[in-house]
Amino acid sequence: MHAKSLTELRAALAAKECSAVELAQHYLKRIDAARDLNAFVHVDADLTLAQAKAADAELARGAGGALTGLPIAHKDVFVTRGWRSTAGSKMLANYESPFDATVVARLQAAGMVTLGKTNMDEFAMGSSNENSAFGAVKNPWDTNAVPGGSSGGSSAAVAARLAPAATGTDTGGSIRQPASFAGVTGIKPTYGRVSRYGMIAFASSLDQGGPMAQSASDCALLLNAMAGFDERDSTSLERDDEDFTRHLGQPWAAGNDAGKPLAGLRIGLPNEYFGAGLADDVRATIDAALKQYEALGATLVPVSLPKTELSIPVYYVIAPAEASSNLSRFDGVRFGHRAAQYGDLLDMYKKSRAEGFGPEVKRRILVGTYVLSHGYYDAYYLQAQKIRRIIANDFQEAFKSCDVIMGPASPTVAWDLGAKGDDPVQMYLADIYTLSVSLAGLPGMSVPCGFGAGANAKRPVGLQIIGNYFNEARMLQVADAFQRATDWHKQVPAGV
């Protein structure tokens, strides 16, 4: 049952091959049996089964929609009523929200059943899911490897088929990179497509929620429910609802030959994504995926994104600056960890934050506070914002000659647990291909396209697909065409 996609599970429910309760029970058993992966931080079988029973009642009445009764896991950065919402931090270890995040509420309104909350890097700051206060997550493909971050719990859960789908968030690559490392499909929509209301903030001008699942078609189904205007989020974009599944299985252009469904599609290949730093085995796997696209009729076009290398310093000025502001609310007064012993009020603030935040969060708060301080604001923060605009303009120039941009989601496959923990700069460099997309606010996704070589032969590689603003439906069409021609997205770790 767990090998089925969301679309297949929906058909099974409709044919009464299983009930929503039976489906939920099946996944709950799998979650319990796979505790060693540490993909989940909070599971409540009673809450899950209550939702499943309600879904079965809807289905029995002939009601419900495309997602009714289907299970999903939520990254623990989305607040959920009745479940703890920790953001992977000791600071919020016992926090229970009085309301649901919009993403959670919309998926529940669509009839989906919550399986639990997935592990994550603390406050979404990390690329390996080793920064969680609740322990590191293991990659199901190779338990000596990281699953990526910060949505590593979600990527591991989907890869191990502990859930058919999961929510994630992407600030600088936190959906795409873990999707790549765990061999699943994940999409970061255009900034503002998906409401941030109830998403515990890291960097407000970058944070964006999105789905992670087995396939592009599953992600399209989920995005139909997740996307939409929300007046409670000041950055939410007011646009007409659209069906993200509408191009799936369709040729790129009317009249295309069945064997060349993507004829007319121009794929931009940035020179900067294929230079020094890209591992040979990743390059070979990406090249093979691009040849598959050529076989489907697409044309490869060289493009340039000249400021790609500046995306790392720009991101690590802007994101920590916003984080230092957002995380100032966690002081042990209204909610969050409070030190047991302290002197005056200022001492309580200091000790509560020192005890509640982990090392990486503290590092980024310090960096952010520094770049926003008097005398450095103009030199660092304002300069970074100017370069951010140039990076966005570079993408628009590239899109004049192509329809989508492709390249690796990460320069390497997943690394060993603990391999980069003592070198934050090396960890930051792992996001070189995803950061610029986030800085520009563009949609991007990762699609499984193969594996590494030699010692990395069990570690997946993800192909990144980047689209222009609001072009998610076309990106999903392009990804879906690849997945109809290949089976990388259907492969599972040994023993699953």
From Swiss-Prot:
PROSITE patterns in UniProt: AMIDASES (PS00571)
EC top class, as a word: ligase
Keyword terms: ATP-binding, Ligase, Nucleotide-binding, Protein biosynthesis
Record EC number: 6.3.5.7
Key word Ligase present: yes
Reactions performed catalytically: L-glutamyl-tRNA(Gln) + L-glutamine + ATP + H2O = L-glutaminyl-tRNA(Gln) + L-glutamate + ADP + phosphate + H(+)
Active site (UniProt): 75 (charge relay system), 150 (charge relay system), 174 (acyl-ester intermediate)
GO cellular component, one term: glutamyl-tRNA(Gln) amidotransferase complex
Gene Ontology molecular-function annotations: ATP binding; glutaminyl-tRNA synthase (glutamine-hydrolyzing) activity
GO biological-process terms attached to the record: translation
Gene3D superfamilies tied to this protein: Amidase signature (AS) domain (3.90.1300.10)
Function of the protein: Allows the formation of correctly charged Gln-tRNA(Gln) through the transamidation of misacylated Glu-tRNA(Gln) in organisms which lack glutaminyl-tRNA synthetase. The reaction takes place in the presence of glutamine and ATP through an activated gamma-phospho-Glu-tRNA(Gln).
Family statement drawn from the similarity comment of this UniProt entry: Belongs to the amidase family. GatA subfamily.
Subunit structure, interactors included: Heterotrimer of A, B and C subunits.
UniProt-recorded name of the protein: Glutamyl-tRNA(Gln) amidotransferase subunit A
Organism: Burkholderia cenocepacia (strain HI2424)
